[in-house]
Amino acid sequence: MASTGEIWLQWFSCCFQQQRSPSRRPHQRLRIDRSMIGNPTNFVHTGHIGSADVELSANRLNAISTQMQSKGGYETNSIHSLHAC
């Protein structure tokens, strides 16, 4: 059974990236401003996840994940070392 954290990682893998080289200072963050953010491309609304959905059973979360993956655009990858961007 997948933990809630693993489910969030699967759904929002776009928000995580592999950890950079250790030479980078750990508390240094990339500053993002409006000029770095463009309009969405190939956007397809596949579902809505609300804050109360984290209280759902693992079976229901897996069903939602499967439904979203069936819509396309979701790839499963094995990511070992992550940090939030």
Curated annotation (Swiss-Prot):
CDD domains found in the cross-reference section: CRIB
Coiled coil: none
GO biological process: regulation of cell shape; regulation of Rho protein signal transduction; regulation of signal transduction
Keyword terms of this UniProt record: Cell membrane, Cell shape, Cytoplasm, Cytoskeleton, Lipoprotein, Membrane, Palmitate, Phosphoprotein
Location of the CRIB domain: 37-50
Superkingdom assignment: Eukaryota
Family: Belongs to the CDC42SE/SPEC family.
Protein name: CDC42 small effector protein homolog
Lineage, opening ranks: Eukaryota, Metazoa, Ecdysozoa, Arthropoda, Hexapoda
Protein encoded by which gene: Spec2
